[in-house]
Amino acid sequence: MTKNILIIGGSSDIGLEINNLATAEGHSVYATSRDEAVSNSYDNFIHLDPNQSLDALDDIPEDIHGLVYCPGTINLKSLQRLTLEDIKAEMEVNFYGAFNVIKKVLPNLKKNDGASVVLFSTVAANTGMPMHSSIAASKSALEGFAISLAAELAPRVAINCVAPSIVDTKLASHILSTDERKEASADRH
């Protein structure tokens, strides 16, 4: 059965890989990003900022089987350098955007028993790591939201939150720029 999958964060390497896997299985992917440069990577691309108007999502299919929320941020700063604006920006991307999108497409998800939402968190949300305060706070909010929402929407819609460590992507390239840095990151986890 062909399923309709909505990916928020389609310009991320993770979003692109999920698209590749889903389309290889014959599913229809609808991907969004604030970056229109990736539009040619998708059959169904939607230019969207999850914290602005979500009207562009009015054109997705009425039945969505899966939602993947995977926009990413890496803003590593000490507490002395961290500003309230930094925290707000992380919350906008990592938490408020997820809230906005899920609320908007929930009717589409509820049309399918067994629909699924996958949210991307980080290991930093539950592991004390230097200079990860803002991402840990925003992703912890996302995890708490996921747990409560899973209880609220079960058994019709499954809500899951995955928390990978740093992934070797363009977003993390400045952190994993040398073999030594990659090894240090691997040793940490």
Tell what function each PLM region has.
Residues 153-167:
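Conserved Rossmann-fold SDR core element
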Residues 78-79, 83-91, 181-185:
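Substrate-binding pocket helix/loop in short-chain dehydrogenase/reductase
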